Structures are given as C-alpha cells and as structure tokens.
Amino acid sequence: MSAGSRNKHSKFRNDDQLDISKEEFSRIKEALGNEEFRKLFFDYVDEIQDPANRKIYEEEITQLEKERGVEVRFIHPQPGFVVKTSLDGELKCFINIASSPEIEAPHNEVATNPENGNRGLSWYIPMAQTSSRDDADAKNNHCKVFDVVFHPDALHLAKRNSQFRKCLVDTALDAVEREYQVSLDRANLKFPKLDYKGIARPTVIRKLAENPTAEQLEPHPLQNIYPTAPPTSNPEPRVHPMKTKAAPVPEFTIPRYSIKHSHDVDLSEYTDELDAKLHVTVPRNLVVEIELPLLRSTAECQLDVTSKSVYLLSEKPGAKYRLKMDLPFTVDDKAGSARFDTDLRRLSITLPVVRSSVPQQRDMHDTLRHFSREDSGVELHSNSESPVEEEEADADLSDSKADTSETVTPTATPVHSAPTPFLKKSVHYQLPAKFDCNVLDNVMAFVLHVANVQPDSIEQLREQRSLHIQFATIGSGYYPTHYAFYVELPADEEGGSAIENVEAEAWDNNVVLKLCLSSQSKSPIRYMAGLDATDLNEYPVHGQYTVKPKRRDAQNKESAPLDVKFDHNKESLEVTIRPVPSATEEDEVEEQHEESHEEHQQHAQNKKPSKKQRKRNKKERSLSESACEDIVQEQHAENPAPPAKNFLKLPQRKQRSYSECNDSSVGSGASQRGILKRFSRYGPRPSMSDSCSSIDDYSSSYSCSVDASGASLFSQSFGGIPEEDRSDAGLSESCKKTVRFNDHITKQVFRLDSSILGQRKKNQKRRDLKLRAQQRRLSEGDSVDYEESRGDALKPQGKASNKGNKLHDSGLDLTGTAAGHGSHSDADAKNAMMFEMDEDDVM
C-alpha cells in the first residue's frame, strides 16, 4: 500500500511527518550507540508507562487547566468488543466499542411510531470518539482503528439484548461515517474474538469551569484593550436525531473496481495511410481491477467472463461480494488472464480486445477511399443523421427481415407482414430546394438541383402513377445529407398517365429523372410533388414541347403566287411582296396593317430621333440562334397563320448598282445569286470580294431598286439566307450570318537605323492625311442636306423604323435611280472621287 493511501484517512499529513536533517540523524545514531544513553532512554519509557506516574501527570494537567478556568476530564477506554469491516472498499478497519464511567449513562422514554402508531422505547445513548490511528493487523498489513466510547451500562445492555447490541453497533458506525466522511461496508461485518484492538489511549474532554477562581475575578491589565468577551455559558451537548427506520442492509456488497485501457505503441499508426488510425481509439487490452479487502484468496469467489461482461460472486461469510459489469469493447473471453494480489487484496483481469478482421478492414478502407474523393466544395446542411446511426438502422432492418423469415411456417394459412417503409425512420430526409419539370411527347423529365450526389445511393420505388426516389450527397466534411423526392401524376387526367419506365442519372450539379409514360396517355399539365405521399403540393408543367409534322398549308403558301407592289417616294422606294390571300384572310391582314400603322405614327410623333440615333438605326443587332427560335415559337403561338407581308424602306445611300450589261442576268432565272458591294459613308471601302450573299429561294424578303423611267434596269437584294422550315422572312433577315474577307494586306516595315520618335512622326503624318481626306470628302455640302432630307423621309416610315429595326439593310441602292435628283453620271463621278481618296489614304 502506498503512502498516499495510508494517510488518506489519517489526521496526519505529509507536512506533519518527522522531518530531521542529516546532521540530526547522525547525532541520534551516535547517541543510540552509547550504552549509557540507551539505559537512560529505557528508564524514561518505563516511567511514562507506569500508571502511577501517568496519574500524577493527569492531576498536574487538570490543575493547570483549572487555573485557566477550564475543566478537564480524562477518559480511559475500557475494552468491550471489536467490529471488523472495510473502509471505502479498499482498506481494512477496526472499530473498538469501549466503555468509560465518565460518559453519561443511556436512558429511554416511551414514544409512538408516527408511521404505524405502535408504542416503543426511544433511547438516548451518549458517546465519545477518539481520533483515528494507523495500526497493523495479524499479518502486519496496514489497517485503520477507531474508538467509540459508551457508558458501561450500554455495553451491559448490549450483552443481554441482541436488538440493543445491533442498535449500539449502528450508532458507532454512523458516528465514524459522519465524523470522518468515509463509507463502511455494513454487509460484511465481522466480530473477531478481541476485546480491544491496539493500545488504549486516553482522550480529554474540556469545558469551561462553573466556579471561576479568585485569579480570574481579578481585572486583567489588558482587559480594556480587547473587546468585551461574550458571556460564558455551558454549551448544550450536540444531539443527533435517532433514526426511526433502520437503513436496509444489502445482502452483498458491490466492490470497488476500475477499467483501464491498455494500448501498445504501433509504428504503423503513424503513417499517412487512410486506414492507419482506424484503431487508435480501440485499446489492445482491457485491465479490470477489483478491490477485495476481506478476501484472502480467489478460491473463495466465482468469476465469469463473457465477450461483453464480467460477473464476480463471493458468498463467504464476512466477505460477500457481487459484481456485474458491462465492458465497453468486445473481448476475447478465452484468451484473458486473472491474478490476485494477496498483499493488496486486489484482483486484476486482463482481457484482449477483439478487433475487426482483415476483410472488414479492407471494406472500411474502400469506403474511406470512396468518401475521400474531391467534391465541388458546395457546403451542405449538417442536420442529418450520422453514418453510425444509418448502419444501425440497416442492421435493425436486416434483423427484422431475418425475424420475419424465421416466423414464416409452411402451413397453408397466409402470413401478411407489414410493408417495409421506403424511407428510413432513423434518417432525416430533405426535399430538393429547386427542381424543374419538362414534357416532350411521352417523356416527362425532372431536374433536381442537388450537387455531389452519390450514384450508388440512388434508390427508387416506382408505381403506376407515382415515383419515390431517395439519394445522398457527401460534402467537404465527408458528412452525408439525405434527400427524398416523391412525384405523383393526377388520376383525373383524361386518358390517364401511366409510368412505364424510369431512368435516373446523377451529374455533378443535379439529378435528371426521365419518366417514360405509356403511348396511350396524354401529356400531363400538372403534377403533385413533395417529400412523401403525405406531404404533396401541386405544380403546373411549364415546358411542353411536341414534335409536329410539316403542314401542307405551309407548302401551299410557299407555292402561292406573289403580288409585288412599288411605292415611289422622293427619298426611298417601298416594295411590298405578299402572296395572294384568300377572301377570308384579306380582312384580317388589313386590320392588322391599319393598327400597326397607327401605332408607328403615334410613336414617331412622340419621339423624334436625333442625328446620332438615326445613324445608329442603320446598324441593327443580330439575334442569337436560340433567341430566334424563342421568337418564332411566340409568333406561332400568337398568330398561327401570319400573312407573308414585308415592307422594306431603305434610305438613300451612294452605292454601286448593276450596270446595263447585267440587265439580262438579273431579270432572268427564278433563283438568282449576286455579289453586292455595300460600304459605309465614313468607314473604309473593301473590294468587290469582301461581302457576298446568296439566295436560293423566293421565301425570303425582296428589296428592289427601279429607276424613275420605269426601265427594266433594277437591282435585287435579299436580306439573308432563309433557314429551313421558316416562313418568317423578317426573322431570317435578323438571324443571317455574314462572312467578310478583306484582301488588303497591311505591311509595316521598320528600318534598323530608325528611331521611335521618327516612327511616331510618320504615324502622325498618316493620320493627318487621312483626316484631311475626310474633311475634303465632306466639303461638298451634301452631307448636311443628306441628313436633313433623310430625316424628313424617315418620319412617315414609322412602320419600318419604330419596330426595333427588325430588318437589315441589304446594301443595294434603291434611291439612286428612282427620284430623278441625279443621273448615273453624277453617281459614277462621286464614286470615282471616293475611290481616288481611298487610294490616296492607302498610299
């Protein structure tokens, strides 16, 4: 037993131990070696132990204390009987029940039990306690000794009455536990054949004297310095309430025990492998230590060890122990060992812990490697259940399935088992925050916007009109989040909608569900969706797409004859190309034309475009291919059969037109192809091969230029290449694709002896020449007149200019020969002058 445990229940602390120096120790050693000193020392010991000398010592102490106004009584314990038990389940202790005539005699009174009304005797038993002391038992083992002193009459009654003896023992045990704050083993009390354990030591009871002496009555010189002392009175003895009901004494005592985790140092756990630290928290062995201070050997007890528990039983009188303990890990009960320390009365049990096998470790390693893949870094919610709970739920589900299979009997009576729920009760599921639905023919597609979905976690339950699916995602912390989605088609649809096949695909950012409906069912217009069948909401189907065959009406309209009309104006020429409508369509076309014309006139009056805006209107932004498709669908939905009516109003520009030698080639042939030249007023002018357009069909928009004399000379320009199955010419004009090539090659030559400043001057000179050429080009005075005349001409043309510039300019001159303001020679002269300016700029 260690020194700490020895002094645990002693009033002596480490700082109260004998502390001597080396010099003092050597002096004591030298003195004890002297025979004369030893003789004197033994004489002193005999004098102290002599009862006559002790009586003289007590009288002197009593007289000295009486002079101080304190009455002192020495109590000498007389042997009675001894009680043996254990202290806190780990140390043997002895309680001496002694007697002394200095203690007040016990007395009783008649009392009534308040619980049942029975009459009995209530005993008043005075007692006194001495300080605890350390001692040794018969085998020289450490033990603890307590003295409890009663009046001799109390011990006399205890010898004659067993119930009073038990009451006296319980009173002594309660006094020791209350005074020293310890726990005594009441189930294993022994009464050895001893009258007293150890050597009796007297104790002192002090109290103030009732009759003060003459010296105390004399005033003290320091009496006025200190505050007035409180009046002295005899304190009443401390009375502890008697127990009306005895505490139940257990038949067996639960011994003290401890479980220690033993772990070896394994260098393989300090590597960077994924499975290196799988068993860091799992110990190698479990060491169970049980304190049995009242047992001499383990032959007197029974020990049973299983894979998950330890059971100990001792039925020896005076050492009754019983312990049933559950182990925190599964152990190998056949490979354990036990050892009993007779000195410490301690039983040590070593049990090896069972670890997972190699296949289980390999499966766990694969699972960790699957979880450790890189994700997209999207943070997910952490309010789902843990993987351990999920595994436990799976185990419970498998056990329930096994129990169900075992209860099935081969009798003819059918056994109806409850259906297993699709969603696990121990797992918290979430509904995807966002999902879309589209329908194409008999295919209904759902897009669930959930990222990082594990493909192997997708499970589905398909019925005739419903589908239930669940899946899980793994976030950056390897923590799963479970989702569920339930969709149900309404049963009141005409013709019904039955699900024949389901396909689920997991992508990086979403999950795509494809529901293949039966061929007889119609496309649903709404559906019910939610987490499960008990929580559903109704949603409409937004996107419905059907593949329709090409109608014959469109083919008839393409082959219909065209009606071409020319409207002459001072500044422009309006060409209208329309198919010959039927009698029923003429009224609708006229009404739409009148309404649109009124809207454009009103818009033109409210807003007058400035010069910069009129210049910007020449250029039009082309639409993307997807935007064109959306516009076509909206136009088809609003006007199923729009009339093929196009109005092209082009401003006067200085352009090149076809010469007279090309009249025959232009006017002949149904399908015409031409290479047209179109340049801006202020931009550079490319060559004839820079731009080209080809037309193979009459379904596109037409833009013609006819001279004022009505001759056969005209130029045709087509706004763009019409796309397949498109009857809207204006839309194909905005969606045309143009490829331009420039045959001018820019060459820059640097001389080795030239400086950067000289090159800068050369560039500045070239810019000055170009700016001078532009100013010379605008010095004719026709640019301002051209802008003003063009602005007056654009006002009545609200239909073509205020509609968002839906038509591109084909680049063909429609005004050069129509109004008669200039001749062919004037246009050719201006164009020749422009080309000469370009050549000067290039050189």
Curated annotation (Swiss-Prot):
One of its GO terms (cellular component) is cytoplasm. Residues 387-397, 584-593 have a biased composition (Acidic residues). Coiled coil: none annotated. It is found in: Cytoplasm. The modification Phosphoserine is found at S376, S779. Keywords: Cytoplasm, Phosphoprotein. Required for cytoplasmic pre-assembly of axonemal dyneins, thereby playing a central role in motility in cilia and flagella. Involved in pre-assembly of dynein arm complexes in the cytoplasm before intraflagellar transport loads them for the ciliary compartment. This is Protein kintoun. It comes from Drosophila ananassae (Fruit fly). The gene is Nop17l.
